Curated annotation (Swiss-Prot):
Swiss-Prot/TrEMBL keywords: Endoplasmic reticulum, Lipid metabolism, Membrane, Transmembrane, Transmembrane helix
Protein name according to UniProt: Fat storage-inducing transmembrane protein 1
Membrane topology (Lumenal): 1-18, 76-94, 163-187, 242-249
Subcellular localization(s) per the UniProt record: Endoplasmic reticulum membrane
Record-level GO BP terms: lipid droplet formation; lipid droplet organization; lipid storage; phospholipid biosynthetic process
Annotated HAMAP family: FITM1 (MF_03229), FITM2 (MF_03230)
PANTHER family attached to this UniProt entry: ACYL-COENZYME A DIPHOSPHATASE FITM2 (PTHR23129), FAT STORAGE-INDUCING TRANSMEMBRANE PROTEIN 1 (PTHR23129:SF3)
Length: 290
């Protein structure tokens, strides 16, 4: 006979719990939205500063030139000292794939939302095609340098026996070793990706200043690119500390910087190029973004 009031009380309690959970979810979503808005605004302002962008080049140079000195002050047994560590396998070895995926999504959204023109969007995305060509071309050039400067060695109990055999592929298949000048492809790629991402992401500050659509998806994609840029900086530091010879790292970073200069610093400012980041997107005077 008393089940009616008990059941009613139970239903009322569950309803209150659902209401509280609904309110909690709304609060969490509001906090997440506020953090997303604030974080994207601050990151855009930071990356869009011309002064800080110039300092960023100096930062990368300092990392490559002076970073190897830290090898005397760090634990040589840390996980980052192993070639087989998770970050080296999953991120560094596929750095261009990660960069192209994240940055491609960002460029696609920014350009299309700003212009609503497929042709302009495709033109800006072609910078990533050029970047892929630079990456592939540099990799082949590094292998050619190693072939031209190398010699074949056969491991023996007493040491190494030098062979006057120029065919590197057949010598490696026979179990011999090929030693030549090896430009650090990881240092090259991470340096190039850092400079490229910093250049592309800097456009977001001007995008916001012009009051263009900047919803949560775009802001999230932008912040993911910022996080990836931070990861590349960290992994570049790990690379110069733990791996490769000093000159190999410096040359790799120098080639990456030179590749950035030839493209973003020179060619992309010409009319017969893919265009520099932000070119042709902002045709109206900027206004404060609310």
């Amino acid at each position: 006979m008393e089940r009616g009031p008990v059941v009613g009380a139970g239903l009322g309690a569950r309803a209150r719990i659902r209401t509280l959970l609904g309110c909690l979810v709304k609060v969490l979503l509001w906090v997440a939205s506020a953090l997303l808005y604030f974080g994207s605004e601050q990151a855009a302002r930071l990356l869009g500063s011309p002064c800080l962008r110039r300092l960023y080049h100096a930062w990368l140079a300092a990392v490559v030139i002076f970073g190897p000195l830290l090898q005397f002050h760090v634990n040589p047994r840390t996980i980052f000292a192993s070639h087989g560590n998770f970050f080296n396998i999953k991120f560094v070895n596929s750095a261009w794939g990660w960069t192209c995926t994240f940055l491609g999504g960002f460029v696609l959204l920014v350009v299309f939302l700003a212009t609503r023109r497929v042709a302009v969007t495709a033109r800006h995305l072609s910078r990533l095609v050029v970047g892929a060509a630079v990456w592939r071309g540099a990799g082949r050039a590094f292998l050619l340098i190693e072939d031209l400067t190398g010699s074949c060695f056969e491991p023996l109990p007493q040491g190494l026996l030098l062979h006057e055999l120029p065919d590197r592929r057949s010598r490696l298949a026979a179990g011999h070793q090929w030693r030549g000048y090896t430009v650090s492809s990881h240092t090259f790629l991470l340096t190039f990706c850092c400079l490229l991402m910093a250049e592309e992401a800097a456009v977001f500050a001007k995008y916001l200043a012009h009051g263009l659509p900047a919803g949560a998806p775009l802001r999230l994609v932008f912040l993911l690119n910022v996080l990836l840029l931070g990861l590349w900086n960290f992994l570049l530091l790990c690379t110069v500390i733990y791996f490769h010879q000093y000159t190999h790292k410096v040359v790799g970073a120098a080639v990456g910087t030179f590749a950035w200069y030839l493209t973003y610093g020179s060619w992309y400012h010409q009319p017969w190029s893919p265009g520099s980041p932000g070119h042709g997107l902002f045709t109206h005077p900027s206004r404060k973004h609310n």
